[in-house]
Amino acid sequence: MAPARARLSPALWVVTAAAAATCVSAGRGEVNLLDTSTIHGDWGWLTYPAHGWDSINEVDESFRPIHTYQVCNVMSPNQNNWLRTNWVPRDGARRVYAEIKFTLRDCNSIPGVLGTCKETFNLHYLESDRDLGASTQESQFLKIDTIAADESFTGADLGVRRLKLNTEVRGVGPLSKRGFYLAFQDIGACLAILSLRIYYKKCPAMVRNLAAFSEAVTGADSSSLVEVRGQCVRHSEERDTPKMYCSAEGEWLVPIGKCVCSAGYEERRDACMACELGFYKSAPGDQLCARCPPHSHSATPAAQTCRCDLSYYRAALDPPSAACTRPPSAPVNLISSVNGTSVTLEWAPPLDPGGRSDITYNAVCRRCPWALSHCEACGSGTRFVPQQTSLAQASLLVANLLAHMNYSFWIEAVNGVSNLSPEPRSAAVVNITTNQAAPSQVVVIRQERAGQTSVSLLWQEPEQPNGIILEYEIKYYEKDKEMQSYSTLKAVTTRATVSGLKPGTRYVFQVRARTSAGCGRFSQAMEVETGKPRPRYDTRTIVWICLTLITGLVVLLLLLICKKRHCGYSKAFQDSDEEKMHYQNGQAPPPVFLPLNHPPGKFPETQFSAEPHTYEEPGRAGRSFTREIEASRIHIEKIIGSGESGEVCYGRLQVPGQRDVPVAIKALKAGYTERQRQDFLSEAAIMGQFDHPNIIRLEGVVTRGRLAMIVTEYMENGSLDAFLRTHDGQFTIVQLVGMLRGVGAGMRYLSDLGYIHRDLAARNVLVDGRLVCKVSDFGLSRALEDDPEAAYTTAGGKIPIRWTAPEAIAFRTFSSASDVWSFGVVMWEVLAYGERPYWNMTNQDVISSVEEGYRLPAPMGCPRALHQLMLDCWHKDRAQRPRFAHVVSVLDALVHSPESLRATATVSRCPPPAFARSCFDLRAGGSGNGDLTVGDWLDSIRMGRYRDHFAAGGYSSLGMVLRMNAQDVRALGITLMGHQKKILGSIQTMRAQLSSTQGPRRHL
């Protein structure tokens, strides 16, 4: 017999707890599979063994029936009492939740059950595809969890009828079979199951971004997301496939894609509604319906376009948003001016343009031999200048008319919708009568004789003299100089001799006839070259030749004497081994080319100018050295730079049969001057002569369009100085030397061609995606536009002082050696990661310091070999500077011998007075301390903001500062790389100053 069970009265168990256990309807997104609170009477669950769980039916204080399952076998050990639910279909759910409401007795409140009473129970489940009835076994169930009560009641609670209800929820899954059972296992607790609700979660149906999403059951586990594809609502279409994800909590997450209302519909309250009358929408999208344009209407709802009103039309290329227009009225104020057998017609635009601006004009010519009521077409012999139809201007010349004939001219105004109108076109009409005709053109003209100073011509009478020819007029001029001057000669016969011409000169001759009706047209041009002059030397000529020779000998003798006496340089004259390129009239001199066959190691005695300024028209130079590109092949995408006279854009060049090529487009701004256009085309002509991997490549030019454009290859990383500043400290020394080697190779190529750049700086070097550096900017304009401080203005023009050799500043004379000086400054810029040369010194301070012998110190971490090469480039005597071929060979050697780059340069002397604020004379104090403080030193190098950092780090004297290294500076919290370099560079300078204890200070 089973041991006696400690059982509580059902009334004491459930009466008070009943109110708390009443049914709560499923929350939003929850679907109940089982809810015992809605079951009246016995739940019909299976219990095992028989003396375990008891089914209790009671009523609460309101006399409502209450059903529970209770167990309280706390006196006996090893309890194993099972309570199983009926079979529950899962209804497609992959994960369900069990909400259990129960009460549990505190074991401490029951005497004598210390070893047998428990305060927990187990929850199990079993899946099956059908109802198994009572044939389930314990071993078939899978445990879900062990459940303990948050609150348990005691005997005192029973006395006051206050029981403590517990609610626990457990997830069950993943489920795959058609249904399942839940089972409660009692192991010795005193508890009562008041209700059980089994449910699953789902995401509710909704409309989002005009896409309808149906209900979706959540996933099999708590972290899964179920993808659901939406369907566009009525009258909408997909822009991007609409999708959302249903979370395990029954919430919609991560909306992707959307639908948009179709043409003729607009979005209103998650639906697409038809456009009202008088409104339209021409394309699918988010936009709302728009009101019909002027002179149009929509006859039905959901209109995609608006129909034009009567007598109004819309051209084929007009967008649906354009107003409907109509043909223009007739031109007004038509006047004619008859000149013999030609007439000039002029008129004013129509008073009513029809709402359009694309007005052109057509001319209709009718010949009326007898009366204006009997007219016929003028025929193909009539000539219209510039044309008969599609005239843009309001004037026309009609020639080759018959003499003494009546004509009627109709001038029509048409626009883009004139062809759509069935109505006759409006026209202005004028009737005229021609006068006597002028003679026709002289067709045949030939040379009869040509001497040194005269030419005899012979020609035939015009085929249509149209009267008595009174005289002939001969027009002649030197070839290509007609616009400068020409002369005329009259003749009464068909033969004439023109005298007073220059010997050995090519002349152009034209002839025309004149009658009482006027002059005919000039004949076709005929070229004749006069005879070459015979050499004659009279006494006067011989005397002049002798005087010239004697004068030359005297001048040569004086030059030799001056040379022996060591005549010095003057600002007006320079050595004859280099051409002097002076600025004149405030304009920059043209680029200079050396002969192509001169030895690379020497400068020729004479430099030849082979650039666009030698052409009378820069456009001819451009055609000689550049390729014309059709403007339609260029697609501009964005502006990447701007200057005073132009803009630089990024775009793509369409190449037939190939992919589009990314290019940079330099375009002149509207309103440019002729001088700016000439300089612009000259720069293109210069670039077109170069072909080198380290010179920016010219793709072509556009000169025939509205805007002049230069098209070059696109360099992704922009200018070298800005690129280095952006990537401060990110490259190895070998990489930096490789960049310099590319710039040097490009300059060697230019030098070998005899080209002097004159504006070499890091800002004028471009970098592509493979870190290849290419020399650019051959117009000497960028620095002067972008940074006025970078140019020093003299009476002769502007010079980029910080990059220019001293002799070029002093005498305005440029050479390949001055380009070498500039290359040395570029080397310093690269090793200093784009820092400004000479920092904040004024231009005048730079000039004075360089003249005194100061040279830029080595940047932080600069190899000694590279700084020595810089100093060689900055030699005061330009003849001692290396050639670019030597510079490239040195850089090649350094790249192939990285170990030579390990020794870093040191600053051994103090900078000039212009740098006094950043260089202390520490030797005066002996120990290096003197009266100077750390704060004074920081202020002098403009780093006073870090006073507190040094004080907090314990650096109270300059002696302690001198022992700092890069790690110490970073440890103070100074994170900016540029500020670290500036502080460490100043410390290095002070150390070097202390080490130099012998002799006076000298400049580098």
Swiss-Prot record:
Binding site for ATP: 640-648, 666
Listed PANTHER family: EPH RECEPTOR A5 (PTHR46877), EPHRIN TYPE-A RECEPTOR 8 (PTHR46877:SF7)
Domain Fibronectin type-III: 327-437, 438-533
Catalytic activity: L-tyrosyl-[protein] + ATP = O-phospho-L-tyrosyl-[protein] + ADP + H(+)
Source species taxonomy: Eukaryota, Metazoa, Chordata, Craniata, Vertebrata
Top-level taxon of the source organism: Eukaryota
Segments in the Extracellular topological domain: 27-541
Gene3D superfamilies in UniProt: ephrin a2 ectodomain, Galactose-binding domain-like, Immunoglobulins, Phosphorylase Kinase, domain 1, Transcription Factor, Ets-1, Transferase(Phosphotransferase) domain 1, Tumor Necrosis Factor Receptor, subunit A, domain 2
Function field: Receptor tyrosine kinase which binds promiscuously GPI-anchored ephrin-A family ligands residing on adjacent cells, leading to contact-dependent bidirectional signaling into neighboring cells. The signaling pathway downstream of the receptor is referred to as forward signaling while the signaling pathway downstream of the ephrin ligand is referred to as reverse signaling. The GPI-anchored ephrin-A EFNA2, EFNA3, and EFNA5 are able to activate EPHA8 through phosphorylation. With EFNA5 may regulate integrin-mediated cell adhesion and migration on fibronectin substrate but also neurite outgrowth.
GO CC terms: early endosome membrane; neuron projection; plasma membrane
One GO MF term: GPI-linked ephrin receptor activity
Chief location category: membrane
Gene transcribed to yield this protein: Epha8
Record note on modification: Phosphorylated. Phosphorylation is stimulated upon binding of its ligands including EFNA2, EFNA3 and EFNA5. Autophosphorylation on Tyr-615 is critical for association with FYN. Autophosphorylation on Tyr-838 modulates tyrosine kinase activity.
Gene Ontology biological process terms in this record: axon guidance; cell adhesion; cellular response to follicle-stimulating hormone stimulus; ephrin receptor signaling pathway; neuron projection development; neuron remodeling; positive regulation of MAPK cascade; positive regulation of phosphatidylinositol 3-kinase/protein kinase B signal transduction
Family, per entry: Belongs to the protein kinase superfamily. Tyr protein kinase family. Ephrin receptor subfamily.
Phenotype upon changing residue 792 to F: Reduced phosphorylation
Protein name: Ephrin type-A receptor 8
Active site: 759 (proton acceptor)
Region (Mediates interaction with ANKS1A and ANKS1B): 563-569
Tissue: Specifically expressed in the central nervous system.
Cytoplasmic side: 563-1004
